UniProtKB/Swiss-Prot annotation:
A zinc finger (C2H2-type) spans 256-278, 284-306, 312-334, 340-362, 368-390, 396-418, 424-446, 452-474, 480-502, 508-530, 536-558, 564-586, 592-614, 620-642. This is Zinc finger protein 418. Belongs to the krueppel C2H2-type zinc-finger protein family. It is found in: Nucleus. Transcriptional repressor. May play a role as regulator of the ubiquitin-proteasome system and autophagy-lysosomal pathway. Residues 25-100 form the KRAB domain. It comes from the Eukaryota. One of its GO terms (molecular function) is DNA-binding transcription repressor activity. It comes from Mus musculus (Mouse). The keyword Repeat applies. Keywords: Metal-binding, Nucleus, Repeat, Zinc, Zinc-finger.
C-alpha cells in the first residue's frame, strides 16, 4: 500500500506561476498502476482514495499546461505535456488530447506495470466540452467528465465485442448499484463507435475540427460516419444510463446524476436532497408535532401551520397563505387559468395534483387501501375521511349548535342552515340553493340535459356521480349478490343498504320522536316535519314544499303538462305515480292487504285509513267542538255544521 502514499508526491508550489518542472512531464510520470491482483486487495475506500489522488494529480498537470500566453513566453522553464499515444512533446496540447490521455489511463488502472496504456480509440469529440476551455480545471469537472465519459463509452463493456477488452476495476467502482434487468422501461438504442489503431489519424483529424459545443448526449450523431471518420458500431441497451434527447447541457450544467432514476442535477447538494426520495430519509423534524421532512424548506413551511404565519398575500382579495405555491394556485381563481387538461375527457384543472387524481377515474386505479376494511380509494384525502368511520373522529364542530362532522365540507353545508343563506338561484323557476352543485343539478330538470356519456354503451346521465356508478358495470368483474333475492350490486356498501329491506334494520333514528329509517336521506327528510322547514318554493304561486320532487310535481300544475298517458283509456296525468295508481283500475290489482281482516286495496292511503277502523285511531280533531274523525274529509264535512256554509247548491 506504499504506492497510495507515493501518489501524493507531486511537485507543488505555494505561489502561482512559480512551478518549474525540468523536462517533459506526463501523466505517467505521476501515475501509479496496480495489477489486477493488487487492485482486488484494495477495499472501497482505498480505491476511492486512489482515484481521487489520480484526478488531483491530473488537475495539477493540466493546470501547468494552461498558463496564459504571456507567462508561457516569459518563463524560462515551460512544462511540456507528452501525449500518451505518440510520446511527442508539444507546448500547447489540445484539451481533448489531455482528457483523452487521462481517460485512457484511468480506465486502465488495472493494467500491469510497465505496459503501455492502451484503449480502443474513443470519439474524443465527446471530451471537447465547454468547461475544458477554462484555464484552471476544478476537480469536480474532471471527476464529472470521467464518469460521464465512462457512462457513454461503455454502459456494459462485457456485452460489446467491438471494444476488444473489458474495462478495469475503476469502471466497477464508478458504476452504480446493480439494477434488475427490465426495471427501467425507458431505454435508448445508441450506436456506439470504436476505432482501431489504423484509424487513429482519421480520428485525430476529426477531433481538430470539432466544435467545443459538442455534448455527450449528441454521441450517436457524432459517431454516425461523418467526413473523415470511420466507425464500427454496435447496438446496445443503456438501461441504467439512458438519457432523453431533451436533456441538453446535462454534462455542462447538470453533472450530477441519480443512479436510481437517471435524473441529472446541477449541484451535488440538490442531488442529495433528491436521493432522499429513494431512501425515504427525512432528517428535518417538527418540534411541535413530530412530523418529518426531507428538506429544511418544507419544514419551514410546515412550521407556519403551528405559528399561524401567512406571509404570502393575494393582491386581488387580500387572502394570505403560508407558502408561495398555495398563493400561486389561489391566483388562478382570479385569472381563470386552468392549465392542466385531461387527455381522456378534456376536463381542465387548476392544479396538476387534481389532474393526476382525476385520471384515476379513467384507469379505475385505487392505490390507497384502508387497513381496517381493505376498501380502496383513488384519493388519499378520501381514505383519510373514510378512516374516520372506523375511528369515529369528527374534528369539525358547528359553533351554533355544537354538531360535529367528519368533513369540513359537511360543516360548511350545515352552517348555512343556521344562517339561512341560499346564494344560488335558478333563473328559470327562482328556486334558491345553498350549494352551486345542487343548482346545476336542478337546472337540468328544466333542460333535460344529460352531459355525461358512458363510452362503453353510450348511455347519458344527468350527474357525473351516476356515470361513475354506472361505469362500474363495465369495469367491475366482481359483483355483490344478495342472498335473499339474488339482486346484484357493484359496491358492497350498496348491497348492505339493500339488505336492510329484508332484515328490517333501521339504523338511522330520529332524536325527536324515536322513529327509525333505513337510509340517512329519509331521516333528513323526516326531520323537516319537526322543524317545519320547507326549503323548496314555487316561483309561480309561492307555495313551499319539503321535498324537491314535490315541487317538481307541483310545477306541472302551472305548466299543465301531463306527459304520462294511460294506454287503456288515453287519460293523461302529470305524475307517473298517478298513472300507476290509475292503471290498477283496469288491471284490478290490489297490492295492499290489511293484516287484520285480509281486505285488499289499490292504494296505500286507503289501507292506512282502513286500519283506523281496527285501531280506533281518530287523528283529525275539530277545533270547535273537539270531536275527532279518522279521515280528514270527514272532518271537513263536519266543520260545515259550525260555519253554516252550504257549498252544494241544487241547480234546479
Amino acid at each position: 500500500m506504499a504506492a497510495l502514499k507515493h501518489l501524493a508526491q507531486v511537485p507543488r508550489s505555494t505561489e502561482k506561476g512559480m512551478v518549474c518542472i525540468q523536462g517533459c512531464v506526463t501523466f505517467e510520470d505521476v501515475a501509479v498502476y496496480f495489477s489486477q491482483e493488487e487492485w482486488e486487495l484494495l477495499d472501497e475506500s482505498q480505491r476511492l482514495l486512489y482515484l481521487d489522488v489520480m484526478l488531483e494529480n491530473f488537475t495539477l498537470i493540466t493546470s501547468l499546461a494552461h498558463w496564459s500566453e504571456a507567462e508561457a513566453e516569459d518563463k524560462t522553464c515551460a512544462p511540456q505535456i507528452r501525449t500518451a499515444k505518440e510520446g511527442l512533446p508539444t507546448k500547447k496540447p489540445h484539451p481533448s488530447d489531455i482528457c483523452s490521455t487521462v481517460l485512457k489511463d484511468i480506465l486502465h488502472l488495472s493494467d500491469l506495470p510497465g505496459q503501455k496504456p492502451h484503449l480502443t480509440e474513443v470519439c474524443t469529440d465527446l471530451l471537447d466540452q465547454k468547461h475544458h476551455r477554462a484555464k484552471n480545471w476544478l476537480k469536480k469537472d474532471v471527476d464529472s467528465l470521467v464518469k460521464n465519459c465512462i457512462f457513454h463509452v461503455a454502459g456494459n463493456p462485457s456485452v460489446c465485442s467491438k471494444i476488444g477488452e473489458k474495462f478495469p476495476a475503476v469502471w466497477n467502482l464508478l458504476q452504480p448499484k446493480a439494477i434488475p434487468k427490465g426495471e427501467k422501461q425507458n431505454q435508448i438504442k445508441c450506436r456506439k463507435a470504436f476505432h482501431s489503431e489504423k484509424n487513429n489519424s482519421k480520428s485525430d483529424k476529426y477531433n481538430k475540427s470539432s466544435s467545443p459545443q459538442h455534448r455527450l448526449h449528441e454521441y450517436p450523431r457524432l459517431c454516425s460516419g461523418k467526413e473523415g471518420f470511420e466507425s464500427n458500431s454496435c447496438e446496445q441497451d443503456l438501461n441504467k444510463y439512458s438519457i432523453a434527447p431533451s436533456q441538453t447541457d446535462q454534462t455542462e450544467n447538470r453533472p450530477y446524476g441519480c443512479h436510481d432514476c437517471g435524473k441529472w442535477f446541477g449541484q451535488k447538494a440538490t442531488l442529495r436532497i433528491h436521493q432522499r426520495r429513494h431512501t425515504g430519509e427525512k432528517p428535518y423534524r417538527c418540534g411541535e408535532c413530530g412530523k418529518s421532512f426531507c428538506q429544511s424548506s418544507n419544514l419551514s413551511e410546515h412550521c407556519r401551520v403551528h405559528s399561524g404565519e401567512r406571509p404570502f398575500e393575494c393582491l386581488e382579495c387580500g387572502k394570505a397563505f403560508g407558502c408561495h405555491s398555495s398563493l400561486l394556485r389561489h391566483q388562478r381563481t382570479h385569472t381563470g387559468e386552468w392549465p392542466y387538461e385531461c387527455g381522456d375527457c378534456g376536463r381542465l384543472f387548476r392544479q396538476i395534483v387534481s389532474l393526476i387524481t382525476h385520471q384515476r377515474t379513467h384507469t379505475t386505479e385505487k392505490p390507497y387501501e384502508c387497513g381496517q376494511c381493505e376498501k380502496s380509494f383513488s384519493h388519499k384525502a378520501t381514505l383519510t375521511v373514510h378512516q374516520r368511520v372506523h375511528t369515529g373522529e369528527k374534528p369539525y364542530h358547528c359553533e351554533a349548535c355544537g354538531k360535529s362532522f367528519s368533513q369540513s365540507a359537511n360543516l360548511i353545508k350545515h352552517s348555512k342552515i343556521h344562517t339561512g343563506e341560499k346564494p344560488y338561484k335558478c333563473g328559470e323557476c327562482g328556486l334558491c340553493f345553498r350549494q352551486r352543485a345542487t343548482l346545476m343539478k336542478h337546472q337540468r330538470t328544466h333542460t333535460s340535459e344529460r352531459p355525461y356519456e358512458c363510452r362503453e354503451c353510450g348511455k347519458f346521465f344527468k350527474q357525473y356521480f351516476y356515470l361513475i356508478e354506472h361505469s362500474r358495470i363495465h369495469t367491475t368483474t366482481e359483483f355483490y349478490e344478495c342472498g335473499q333475492c339474488g339482486k346484484s350490486y357493484t359496491q358492497n356498501a350498496t348491497l348492505i343498504r339493500h339488505q336492510r329491506v329484508h332484515t328490517g334494520e333501521s339504523p338511522y333514528k330520529c332524536k325527536e320522536c324515536g322513529k327509525a329509517f333505513e337510509y340517512k336521506s329519509r331521516l333528513n327528510r323526516h326531520q323537516r316535519t319537526h322543524t317545519g322547514e320547507r326549503p323548496y318554493e314555487c316561483a309561480k304561486c309561492g307555495k313551499f314544499f319539503r321535498e324537491s320532487y314535490n315541487l317538481a310535481e307541483h310545477q306541472k300544475i302551472h305548466t299543465k303538462a301531463k306527459p304520462y298517458n294511460c294506454d287503456q283509456c288515453g287519460k293523461c296525468f302529470s305524475r307517473r305515480a298517478d298513472l300507476v295508481k290509475h292503471q290498477r283500475v283496469h288491471t284490478g290489482e290490489r297490492p295492499y292487504t290489511c293484516g287484520e281482516c285480509g281486505k285488499t286495496f289499490s292504494r296505500t292511503t286507503n289501507l292506512v285509513q282502513h286500519r283506523r277502523i281496527h285501531t280506533g285511531e281518530r287523528p283529525y280533531e275539530c277545533d270547535q267542538c273537539g270531536k275527532s274523525f279518522s279521515q280528514v274529509s270527514t272532518l271537513t264535512r263536519h266543520q260545515l255544521l259550525h260555519t253554516g256554509e252550504k257549498s252544494y247548491k241544487c241547480s234546479k
